[in-house]
Amino acid sequence: MSFKVNWKSLETDSLTSWTKDLLTSALNSGKSPNILASSISIKDLNFGKIAPNFEILEIGELGRDRFRGIFKINYEGDFHLTLHTNVQANPLNIYYSNSMEKEIDSQFVTPNFLLSNEQFALPLDLKLSDIKISGIGIIVFSKSKGLTLVFRNDPLDSIKVSSTFDTVQVLANFLQKQIETQIRDLFRETLPTLIHQFSLKYLSLDNNSDDLHAHFASSSRTHSSALDPDNEFNNFTYSSKNLQKNLQLFNTRETLDLHIPKFKGIIQRSHLEKFTQNYPSLLNSLYLNLHEIDMKSYNTYNNNTGSNGIPIDLLINDKNFNRTNRVLKEISDIQSNSFYKQSNNNKDTTVKPKRRRIKYSTRKKAASPTSTLINDDFHMASLHSSVASSMPMSMSSSLSDSEERPQLLAQPRPMRISPDFYQAFLKSTPEQCWYQCKRVGLGTNYFNFATSQPISTSPIKKDPARDFIKEKKSINYIDINKVNNKLKELSMDRSGKRKQRNYGSATYESENPIVAPPPPYSH
Protein backbone atom coordinates (compact mmCIF):
# COMPACT_ATOMS: atom_id res chain seq x y z
CA MET A 1 0.00 0.00 0.00
CA SER A 2 1.43 3.39 -0.99
CA PHE A 3 0.35 6.99 -0.50
CA LYS A 4 0.75 10.23 -2.40
CA VAL A 5 1.58 13.13 -0.12
CA ASN A 6 0.27 16.58 -1.07
CA TRP A 7 3.54 18.38 -0.42
CA LYS A 8 2.20 21.76 -1.50
CA SER A 9 -0.09 21.88 1.53
CA LEU A 10 3.00 22.25 3.75
CA GLU A 11 3.85 25.62 2.25
CA THR A 12 1.88 27.59 4.82
CA ASP A 13 3.12 30.27 7.21
CA SER A 14 1.49 28.68 10.24
CA LEU A 15 3.16 25.31 9.69
CA THR A 16 6.50 26.97 8.95
CA SER A 17 6.43 29.09 12.12
CA TRP A 18 5.30 26.11 14.22
CA THR A 19 8.15 24.00 12.81
CA LYS A 20 10.67 26.77 13.49
CA ASP A 21 9.56 27.08 17.11
CA LEU A 22 9.69 23.32 17.53
CA LEU A 23 13.21 23.05 16.11
CA THR A 24 14.46 26.08 18.07
CA SER A 25 13.26 24.68 21.40
CA ALA A 26 14.71 21.26 20.55
CA LEU A 27 18.13 22.64 19.54
CA ASN A 28 18.43 24.93 22.58
CA SER A 29 17.19 22.38 25.10
CA GLY A 30 19.73 21.24 27.63
CA LYS A 31 23.12 22.74 28.35
CA SER A 32 24.81 24.36 25.37
CA PRO A 33 28.53 23.67 24.79
CA ASN A 34 31.09 26.29 25.74
CA ILE A 35 32.13 26.80 22.13
CA LEU A 36 28.78 28.46 21.38
CA ALA A 37 28.58 32.12 22.36
CA SER A 38 24.82 32.45 21.75
CA SER A 39 21.72 30.36 21.21
CA ILE A 40 20.81 28.67 17.92
CA SER A 41 18.10 30.23 15.77
CA ILE A 42 16.36 29.10 12.57
CA LYS A 43 17.27 31.56 9.84
CA ASP A 44 15.62 29.85 6.86
CA LEU A 45 13.33 26.84 6.46
CA ASN A 46 12.06 25.54 3.13
CA PHE A 47 10.34 22.18 2.62
CA GLY A 48 10.99 22.22 -1.13
CA LYS A 49 8.73 20.98 -3.94
CA ILE A 50 9.66 17.30 -4.14
CA ALA A 51 7.64 15.04 -1.86
CA PRO A 52 9.02 11.89 -0.20
CA ASN A 53 7.83 8.38 -1.09
CA PHE A 54 6.00 6.73 1.78
CA GLU A 55 5.06 3.05 1.55
CA ILE A 56 3.38 0.77 4.14
CA LEU A 57 4.92 -2.68 4.03
CA GLU A 58 2.88 -4.43 6.73
CA ILE A 59 0.00 -3.74 9.12
CA GLY A 60 0.30 -5.90 12.20
CA GLU A 61 -2.60 -4.55 14.26
CA LEU A 62 -5.40 -2.16 13.42
CA GLY A 63 -8.10 -0.93 15.76
CA ARG A 64 -10.04 2.10 16.83
CA ASP A 65 -7.52 3.16 19.49
CA ARG A 66 -4.37 1.32 18.37
CA PHE A 67 -2.23 0.75 15.29
CA ARG A 68 1.01 -1.07 14.52
CA GLY A 69 2.68 -1.20 11.10
CA ILE A 70 5.95 -1.25 9.17
CA PHE A 71 6.66 1.45 6.57
CA LYS A 72 9.39 2.49 4.13
CA ILE A 73 10.39 6.06 3.35
CA ASN A 74 12.61 7.43 0.56
CA TYR A 75 13.46 11.11 0.08
CA GLU A 76 15.73 12.88 -2.40
CA GLY A 77 14.34 16.39 -2.47
CA ASP A 78 15.30 20.04 -2.29
CA PHE A 79 14.65 20.61 1.41
CA HIS A 80 17.12 23.00 3.03
CA LEU A 81 17.55 24.44 6.51
CA THR A 82 19.78 27.36 7.61
CA LEU A 83 20.89 27.80 11.22
CA HIS A 84 22.47 30.90 12.73
CA THR A 85 24.59 31.19 15.89
CA ASN A 86 27.76 32.77 17.28
CA VAL A 87 30.88 30.69 17.84
CA GLN A 88 33.52 31.36 20.50
CA ALA A 89 36.83 31.92 18.70
CA ASN A 90 38.97 32.44 21.84
CA PRO A 91 40.54 29.06 22.69
CA LEU A 92 41.71 30.31 26.11
CA ASN A 93 38.15 31.17 27.07
CA ILE A 94 36.93 27.73 25.93
CA TYR A 95 39.67 25.97 27.92
CA TYR A 96 38.96 28.13 30.97
CA SER A 97 35.23 27.35 30.84
CA ASN A 98 35.82 23.61 30.40
CA SER A 99 38.28 23.52 33.31
CA MET A 100 35.83 25.37 35.54
CA GLU A 101 33.17 22.77 34.82
CA LYS A 102 35.26 19.59 35.05
CA GLU A 103 38.13 20.31 37.44
CA ILE A 104 37.38 23.39 39.55
CA ASP A 105 34.23 24.30 41.44
CA SER A 106 32.46 27.52 40.51
CA GLN A 107 32.91 28.87 44.07
CA PHE A 108 36.69 28.52 43.85
CA VAL A 109 38.45 31.86 43.57
CA THR A 110 40.47 32.08 40.35
CA PRO A 111 42.55 34.92 38.91
CA ASN A 112 40.66 37.12 36.50
CA PHE A 113 42.84 37.12 33.37
CA LEU A 114 41.61 39.57 30.79
CA LEU A 115 42.77 37.63 27.76
CA SER A 116 41.33 34.28 28.80
CA ASN A 117 38.00 35.65 30.00
CA GLU A 118 37.41 37.97 27.08
CA GLN A 119 34.90 36.60 24.57
CA PHE A 120 35.59 36.70 20.86
CA ALA A 121 32.42 35.60 19.06
CA LEU A 122 32.18 34.97 15.34
CA PRO A 123 28.86 34.63 13.47
CA LEU A 124 28.21 31.26 11.89
CA ASP A 125 25.58 30.33 9.28
CA LEU A 126 25.14 26.60 8.79
CA LYS A 127 23.11 25.35 5.82
CA LEU A 128 21.85 21.77 5.47
CA SER A 129 20.73 20.70 1.99
CA ASP A 130 20.65 17.77 -0.46
CA ILE A 131 19.36 15.37 2.16
CA LYS A 132 18.95 11.74 1.05
CA ILE A 133 16.94 9.47 3.32
CA SER A 134 16.17 5.77 2.81
CA GLY A 135 14.96 3.77 5.77
CA ILE A 136 12.48 1.26 7.17
CA GLY A 137 10.63 2.13 10.33
CA ILE A 138 7.99 0.79 12.72
CA ILE A 139 5.04 2.86 13.91
CA VAL A 140 3.12 1.87 17.05
CA PHE A 141 0.15 3.99 18.11
CA SER A 142 -1.92 3.63 21.25
CA LYS A 143 -4.43 6.06 22.68
CA SER A 144 -3.11 5.54 26.20
CA LYS A 145 0.64 5.29 25.43
CA GLY A 146 0.99 7.66 22.47
CA LEU A 147 2.89 7.31 19.18
CA THR A 148 6.23 5.50 18.93
CA LEU A 149 8.54 5.64 15.88
CA VAL A 150 11.61 3.40 15.56
CA PHE A 151 13.94 2.96 12.55
CA ARG A 152 15.42 -0.45 11.84
CA ASN A 153 18.42 0.94 9.98
CA ASP A 154 20.32 4.20 9.64
CA PRO A 155 18.00 6.26 7.40
CA LEU A 156 20.53 8.98 6.51
CA ASP A 157 22.39 8.31 3.27
CA SER A 158 24.05 11.66 2.65
CA ILE A 159 23.77 15.35 3.48
CA LYS A 160 25.52 18.49 2.29
CA VAL A 161 26.81 20.89 4.95
CA SER A 162 27.91 24.39 3.96
CA SER A 163 28.93 27.17 6.33
CA THR A 164 30.77 30.47 6.48
CA PHE A 165 34.00 28.53 7.23
CA ASP A 166 34.08 26.60 3.95
CA THR A 167 37.25 28.41 2.91
CA VAL A 168 39.06 26.64 5.75
CA GLN A 169 39.13 23.01 4.65
CA VAL A 170 39.90 21.65 8.11
CA LEU A 171 36.87 23.33 9.64
CA ALA A 172 34.66 22.32 6.73
CA ASN A 173 35.56 18.64 7.11
CA PHE A 174 35.12 18.85 10.87
CA LEU A 175 31.66 20.40 10.56
CA GLN A 176 30.65 17.83 7.92
CA LYS A 177 31.50 14.90 10.21
CA GLN A 178 29.94 16.48 13.29
CA ILE A 179 26.67 17.34 11.53
CA GLU A 180 26.34 13.86 10.04
CA THR A 181 26.89 12.31 13.48
CA GLN A 182 24.34 14.62 15.09
CA ILE A 183 21.68 13.93 12.42
CA ARG A 184 22.15 10.18 12.80
CA ASP A 185 21.62 10.62 16.54
CA LEU A 186 18.58 12.73 15.70
CA PHE A 187 16.92 9.92 13.72
CA ARG A 188 17.94 7.28 16.26
CA GLU A 189 17.12 8.97 19.60
CA THR A 190 15.92 12.57 19.44
CA LEU A 191 13.18 12.28 16.80
CA PRO A 192 11.40 9.25 18.37
CA THR A 193 11.51 10.96 21.78
CA LEU A 194 10.06 14.23 20.45
CA ILE A 195 7.28 12.47 18.54
CA HIS A 196 6.36 10.40 21.59
CA GLN A 197 6.28 13.44 23.92
CA PHE A 198 4.11 15.52 21.57
CA SER A 199 1.72 12.64 21.02
CA LEU A 200 1.31 12.25 24.77
CA LYS A 201 0.74 15.98 25.08
CA TYR A 202 -2.16 16.05 22.61
CA LEU A 203 -3.61 12.77 23.80
CA SER A 204 -3.50 13.93 27.42
CA LEU A 205 -5.50 17.02 26.47
CA ASP A 206 -8.25 14.84 25.06
CA ASN A 207 -8.15 12.56 28.08
CA ASN A 208 -8.21 15.51 30.47
CA SER A 209 -11.23 17.00 28.71
CA ASP A 210 -13.06 13.69 28.99
CA ASP A 211 -12.11 13.42 32.66
CA LEU A 212 -13.33 16.95 33.32
CA HIS A 213 -16.69 16.24 31.71
CA ALA A 214 -17.05 13.05 33.74
CA HIS A 215 -16.02 14.86 36.95
CA PHE A 216 -18.50 17.68 36.40
CA ALA A 217 -21.25 15.21 35.68
CA SER A 218 -20.51 13.17 38.82
CA SER A 219 -20.23 16.32 41.00
CA SER A 220 -23.59 17.58 39.74
CA ARG A 221 -25.16 14.23 40.59
CA THR A 222 -23.64 14.16 44.08
CA HIS A 223 -24.70 17.78 44.71
CA SER A 224 -28.27 17.00 43.75
CA SER A 225 -28.24 13.87 45.92
CA ALA A 226 -26.86 15.82 48.89
CA LEU A 227 -29.77 18.23 48.70
CA ASP A 228 -32.23 15.38 48.63
CA PRO A 229 -33.89 15.18 52.11
CA ASP A 230 -34.76 11.53 51.61
CA ASN A 231 -31.10 10.49 51.42
CA GLU A 232 -30.13 8.54 54.55
CA PHE A 233 -26.42 8.93 53.95
CA ASN A 234 -26.45 12.55 55.10
CA ASN A 235 -27.55 11.51 58.57
CA PHE A 236 -24.26 9.68 59.09
CA THR A 237 -21.96 12.23 57.46
CA TYR A 238 -22.32 15.01 60.07
CA SER A 239 -23.46 14.70 63.65
CA SER A 240 -25.68 17.34 65.19
CA LYS A 241 -23.62 17.36 68.40
CA ASN A 242 -20.40 17.99 66.52
CA LEU A 243 -22.01 20.79 64.55
CA GLN A 244 -23.23 22.42 67.76
CA LYS A 245 -19.77 22.20 69.35
CA ASN A 246 -18.12 23.70 66.27
CA LEU A 247 -20.70 26.47 66.16
CA GLN A 248 -20.15 27.25 69.84
CA LEU A 249 -16.37 27.42 69.38
CA PHE A 250 -16.79 29.64 66.34
CA ASN A 251 -19.09 32.04 68.16
CA THR A 252 -16.68 32.39 71.10
CA ARG A 253 -14.13 34.00 68.80
CA GLU A 254 -16.62 36.57 67.51
CA THR A 255 -17.32 38.25 70.83
CA LEU A 256 -15.92 41.30 72.59
CA ASP A 257 -16.01 39.58 75.94
CA LEU A 258 -12.73 39.66 77.87
CA HIS A 259 -13.26 36.21 79.36
CA ILE A 260 -12.80 33.99 76.33
CA PRO A 261 -12.89 30.26 77.07
CA LYS A 262 -9.46 28.65 76.70
CA PHE A 263 -8.49 25.30 75.30
CA LYS A 264 -6.15 23.01 77.18
CA GLY A 265 -2.63 22.72 75.79
CA ILE A 266 -3.24 25.33 73.05
CA ILE A 267 -1.73 28.78 72.60
CA GLN A 268 -3.93 31.06 70.55
CA ARG A 269 -2.38 33.01 67.74
CA SER A 270 -3.58 36.31 69.16
CA HIS A 271 -1.61 35.60 72.37
CA LEU A 272 1.41 34.09 70.65
CA GLU A 273 3.33 37.37 70.57
CA LYS A 274 2.93 37.84 74.32
CA PHE A 275 4.16 34.32 74.89
CA THR A 276 7.27 34.63 72.73
CA GLN A 277 8.08 38.21 73.74
CA ASN A 278 9.18 37.31 77.27
CA TYR A 279 10.80 34.04 76.24
CA PRO A 280 14.54 34.33 76.89
CA SER A 281 16.45 33.94 73.67
CA LEU A 282 19.39 35.46 71.89
CA LEU A 283 17.22 37.15 69.27
CA ASN A 284 15.02 38.82 71.89
CA SER A 285 18.09 40.14 73.69
CA LEU A 286 19.47 41.53 70.44
CA TYR A 287 16.15 43.18 69.65
CA LEU A 288 15.98 44.82 73.07
CA ASN A 289 19.63 45.94 73.19
CA LEU A 290 20.09 46.95 69.55
CA HIS A 291 17.40 49.08 67.96
CA GLU A 292 19.01 48.64 64.54
CA ILE A 293 17.21 45.35 63.92
CA ASP A 294 13.90 46.16 62.34
CA MET A 295 10.68 44.54 63.46
CA LYS A 296 10.04 42.92 60.08
CA SER A 297 13.28 40.92 60.03
CA TYR A 298 12.82 40.09 63.72
CA ASN A 299 9.35 38.64 63.18
CA THR A 300 10.40 36.79 60.02
CA TYR A 301 13.37 35.08 61.63
CA ASN A 302 11.54 34.44 64.90
CA ASN A 303 8.64 32.75 63.12
CA ASN A 304 10.78 30.65 60.80
CA THR A 305 13.26 29.40 63.38
CA GLY A 306 12.23 28.48 66.89
CA SER A 307 15.75 27.62 68.04
CA ASN A 308 17.92 29.70 70.35
CA GLY A 309 20.85 29.83 67.93
CA ILE A 310 22.76 32.70 66.38
CA PRO A 311 20.67 34.49 63.69
CA ILE A 312 22.93 33.77 60.72
CA ASP A 313 20.47 35.20 58.19
CA LEU A 314 20.59 38.61 59.82
CA LEU A 315 24.38 38.66 59.51
CA ILE A 316 24.58 37.33 55.95
CA ASN A 317 21.86 39.50 54.43
CA ASP A 318 23.22 42.69 55.99
CA LYS A 319 25.77 44.38 53.72
CA ASN A 320 26.84 47.00 56.29
CA PHE A 321 30.09 45.86 57.95
CA ASN A 322 29.86 48.24 60.93
CA ARG A 323 26.34 47.11 61.73
CA THR A 324 27.35 43.45 61.50
CA ASN A 325 30.32 44.12 63.77
CA ARG A 326 28.04 45.72 66.38
CA VAL A 327 25.68 42.73 66.26
CA LEU A 328 28.57 40.28 66.73
CA LYS A 329 29.94 42.33 69.63
CA GLU A 330 26.51 42.36 71.27
CA ILE A 331 26.24 38.58 70.85
CA SER A 332 29.61 38.09 72.56
CA ASP A 333 28.55 40.41 75.42
CA ILE A 334 25.32 38.48 75.93
CA GLN A 335 27.13 35.16 75.99
CA SER A 336 29.79 36.46 78.41
CA ASN A 337 27.11 37.89 80.73
CA SER A 338 25.39 34.53 80.82
CA PHE A 339 28.70 32.90 81.83
CA TYR A 340 30.08 35.46 84.30
CA LYS A 341 28.19 36.68 87.36
CA GLN A 342 27.92 40.31 88.38
CA SER A 343 28.95 41.25 91.88
CA ASN A 344 26.42 42.75 94.27
CA ASN A 345 28.49 45.85 95.05
CA ASN A 346 29.49 46.89 91.56
CA LYS A 347 27.67 45.85 88.41
CA ASP A 348 30.67 46.56 86.19
CA THR A 349 32.85 43.98 87.89
CA THR A 350 32.15 40.37 87.02
CA VAL A 351 32.92 37.26 88.98
CA LYS A 352 33.83 34.01 87.32
CA PRO A 353 31.61 31.16 88.53
CA LYS A 354 33.19 28.72 90.92
CA ARG A 355 33.86 25.34 89.50
CA ARG A 356 34.07 22.11 91.40
CA ARG A 357 37.71 21.13 91.89
CA ILE A 358 39.23 17.98 93.34
CA LYS A 359 42.72 18.19 94.85
CA TYR A 360 44.98 15.15 94.96
CA SER A 361 47.46 16.07 97.75
CA THR A 362 50.36 13.76 98.58
CA ARG A 363 50.71 14.88 102.20
CA LYS A 364 48.80 12.93 104.82
CA LYS A 365 47.30 14.72 107.77
CA ALA A 366 48.21 13.61 111.28
CA ALA A 367 45.64 11.27 112.70
CA SER A 368 43.63 12.47 115.68
CA PRO A 369 44.10 10.72 119.07
CA THR A 370 40.56 9.40 119.04
CA SER A 371 41.11 7.70 115.69
CA THR A 372 44.38 6.14 116.92
CA LEU A 373 42.63 4.79 119.98
CA ILE A 374 39.87 3.30 117.90
CA ASN A 375 42.34 1.70 115.50
CA ASP A 376 44.40 0.27 118.38
CA ASP A 377 41.32 -1.14 120.01
CA PHE A 378 40.18 -2.69 116.76
CA HIS A 379 43.65 -4.16 116.18
CA MET A 380 43.60 -5.71 119.64
CA ALA A 381 40.14 -7.09 118.94
CA SER A 382 41.33 -8.67 115.70
CA LEU A 383 44.29 -10.24 117.51
CA HIS A 384 41.95 -11.55 120.14
CA SER A 385 39.72 -13.13 117.49
CA SER A 386 42.72 -14.77 115.78
CA VAL A 387 43.99 -16.18 119.09
CA ALA A 388 40.52 -17.41 119.96
CA SER A 389 40.22 -19.22 116.64
CA SER A 390 43.56 -21.00 117.15
CA MET A 391 42.91 -21.90 120.83
CA PRO A 392 40.58 -24.68 121.96
CA MET A 393 36.87 -24.06 122.41
CA SER A 394 36.96 -24.20 126.21
CA MET A 395 39.72 -21.66 126.54
CA SER A 396 38.12 -19.32 124.05
CA SER A 397 34.79 -19.53 125.82
CA SER A 398 36.43 -18.77 129.15
CA LEU A 399 38.20 -15.80 127.73
CA SER A 400 35.02 -14.51 126.15
CA ASP A 401 33.18 -14.86 129.43
CA SER A 402 35.87 -13.13 131.43
CA GLU A 403 36.31 -10.22 129.06
CA GLU A 404 33.49 -8.32 127.38
CA ARG A 405 34.52 -6.47 124.26
CA PRO A 406 32.81 -3.15 123.66
CA GLN A 407 31.19 -2.40 120.32
CA LEU A 408 33.54 -0.42 118.11
CA LEU A 409 32.21 1.68 115.28
CA ALA A 410 35.31 1.80 113.11
CA GLN A 411 36.45 0.83 109.69
CA PRO A 412 37.14 -2.95 109.67
CA ARG A 413 40.59 -4.22 108.79
CA PRO A 414 41.53 -7.60 107.32
CA MET A 415 42.34 -10.28 109.91
CA ARG A 416 45.93 -11.41 110.04
CA ILE A 417 46.32 -15.19 109.79
CA SER A 418 49.17 -16.99 111.48
CA PRO A 419 51.80 -18.58 109.17
CA ASP A 420 51.00 -22.17 110.24
CA PHE A 421 47.25 -21.72 109.99
CA TYR A 422 46.83 -23.94 106.92
CA GLN A 423 48.97 -26.79 108.33
CA ALA A 424 47.13 -26.68 111.64
CA PHE A 425 43.80 -26.77 109.85
CA LEU A 426 44.76 -29.89 107.86
CA LYS A 427 45.99 -31.69 110.97
CA SER A 428 42.91 -30.83 113.03
CA THR A 429 40.36 -31.92 110.39
CA PRO A 430 39.69 -35.71 110.34
CA GLU A 431 39.96 -37.68 107.12
CA GLN A 432 36.79 -38.00 105.13
CA CYS A 433 34.92 -41.26 104.79
CA TRP A 434 35.49 -41.64 101.08
CA TYR A 435 39.26 -41.81 101.58
CA GLN A 436 38.97 -44.98 103.70
CA CYS A 437 35.82 -46.68 102.37
CA LYS A 438 36.31 -49.04 99.52
CA ARG A 439 33.80 -49.36 96.72
CA VAL A 440 33.44 -51.51 93.65
CA GLY A 441 35.00 -49.93 90.61
CA LEU A 442 38.21 -49.01 88.93
CA GLY A 443 40.95 -48.75 91.55
CA THR A 444 40.27 -48.02 95.17
CA ASN A 445 39.08 -45.21 97.40
CA TYR A 446 36.04 -44.59 95.18
CA PHE A 447 37.91 -43.21 92.18
CA ASN A 448 39.94 -40.89 94.39
CA PHE A 449 43.52 -41.31 93.26
CA ALA A 450 44.85 -38.50 95.40
CA THR A 451 46.71 -39.40 98.56
CA SER A 452 45.19 -38.69 101.93
CA GLN A 453 48.39 -37.02 103.12
CA PRO A 454 48.23 -33.26 103.33
CA ILE A 455 49.95 -31.25 100.67
CA SER A 456 53.46 -30.39 101.76
CA THR A 457 54.20 -26.77 101.23
CA SER A 458 57.14 -24.67 102.11
CA PRO A 459 56.66 -22.94 105.43
CA ILE A 460 55.84 -19.29 105.32
CA LYS A 461 58.68 -17.19 106.60
CA LYS A 462 57.78 -15.47 109.81
CA ASP A 463 60.42 -12.84 109.43
CA PRO A 464 60.08 -10.46 106.53
CA ALA A 465 62.42 -11.15 103.67
CA ARG A 466 65.55 -9.15 103.73
CA ASP A 467 66.73 -7.52 100.59
CA PHE A 468 70.33 -8.42 100.04
CA ILE A 469 72.10 -5.84 97.99
CA LYS A 470 74.29 -7.52 95.41
CA GLU A 471 77.31 -5.73 94.24
CA LYS A 472 77.49 -5.31 90.52
CA LYS A 473 80.44 -7.14 89.01
CA SER A 474 82.11 -6.38 85.76
CA ILE A 475 82.02 -8.66 82.76
CA ASN A 476 85.77 -9.48 83.09
CA TYR A 477 85.47 -10.49 86.74
CA ILE A 478 87.00 -13.95 87.55
CA ASP A 479 85.91 -15.85 90.63
CA ILE A 480 89.07 -17.56 92.00
CA ASN A 481 87.12 -19.78 94.40
CA LYS A 482 85.06 -21.32 91.60
CA VAL A 483 88.21 -21.94 89.56
CA ASN A 484 89.95 -23.68 92.48
CA ASN A 485 86.89 -25.85 93.16
CA LYS A 486 86.71 -26.85 89.49
CA LEU A 487 90.42 -27.83 89.49
CA LYS A 488 89.95 -29.97 92.58
CA GLU A 489 87.01 -31.79 90.96
CA LEU A 490 89.08 -32.51 87.84
CA SER A 491 92.02 -33.84 89.86
CA MET A 492 89.72 -36.13 91.84
CA ASP A 493 88.17 -37.46 88.63
CA ARG A 494 91.58 -38.25 87.16
CA SER A 495 92.78 -40.05 90.30
CA GLY A 496 89.62 -42.10 90.61
CA LYS A 497 89.41 -43.00 86.96
CA ARG A 498 88.96 -46.69 86.30
CA LYS A 499 89.77 -48.83 83.38
CA GLN A 500 87.46 -48.65 80.43
CA ARG A 501 84.47 -50.97 80.82
CA ASN A 502 83.71 -53.49 78.17
CA TYR A 503 79.90 -53.76 77.81
CA GLY A 504 80.22 -56.44 75.06
CA SER A 505 81.55 -59.10 77.46
CA ALA A 506 79.91 -60.43 80.55
CA THR A 507 82.81 -59.42 82.83
CA TYR A 508 84.84 -56.22 82.89
CA GLU A 509 87.44 -54.66 85.22
CA SER A 510 85.90 -52.59 87.95
CA GLU A 511 85.98 -52.42 91.72
CA ASN A 512 82.22 -52.82 91.85
CA PRO A 513 81.21 -55.45 89.28
CA ILE A 514 78.07 -54.54 87.37
CA VAL A 515 75.96 -56.91 85.33
CA ALA A 516 76.21 -56.32 81.60
CA PRO A 517 73.19 -54.82 79.87
CA PRO A 518 70.84 -57.04 77.80
CA PRO A 519 71.78 -57.90 74.19
CA PRO A 520 69.83 -55.16 72.42
CA TYR A 521 71.78 -52.54 74.33
CA SER A 522 75.23 -54.18 74.02
CA HIS A 523 77.89 -52.33 72.09
UniProtKB/Swiss-Prot annotation:
UniProt record similarity statement: Belongs to the MDM34 family.
InterPro entries per the UniProt record, alphabetical: Mdm34, SMP_LBD
Alphabetic keyword roster: Lipid transport, Lipid-binding, Membrane, Mitochondrion, Mitochondrion outer membrane, Transmembrane, Transmembrane beta strand, Transport
Subcellular location: Mitochondrion outer membrane
GO biological process: mitochondrial genome maintenance; mitochondrion-endoplasmic reticulum membrane tethering; phospholipid transport
CC terms in the record's Gene Ontology section: ERMES complex
Superkingdom of this protein's organism: Eukaryota
UniProt cross-references to PROSITE patterns, sorted A to Z: SMP
UniProt keyword annotation of Transmembrane present: yes
Gene Ontology MF, one: lipid binding
Record text about domains: Lacks alpha-helical transmembrane segments, suggesting that it resides in the membrane via beta-sheet conformations similar to those predicted for other outer membrane proteins and porin. The SMP-LTD domain is a barrel-like domain that can bind various types of glycerophospholipids in its interior and mediate their transfer between two adjacent bilayers.
Membrane topology: Multi-pass membrane protein
Lineage: Eukaryota, Fungi, Dikarya, Ascomycota, Saccharomycotina
Region (Disordered): 489-523
Domain named SMP-LTD: residues: 1-200
Function: Component of the ERMES/MDM complex, which serves as a molecular tether to connect the endoplasmic reticulum (ER) and mitochondria. Components of this complex are involved in the control of mitochondrial shape and protein biogenesis, and function in nonvesicular lipid trafficking between the ER and mitochondria. MDM34 is required for the interaction of the ER-resident membrane protein MMM1 and the outer mitochondrial membrane-resident beta-barrel protein MDM10.
Signal peptide: none
Protein name according to UniProt: Mitochondrial distribution and morphology protein 34
Subunit: Component of the ER-mitochondria encounter structure (ERMES) or MDM complex, composed of MMM1, MDM10, MDM12 and MDM34.
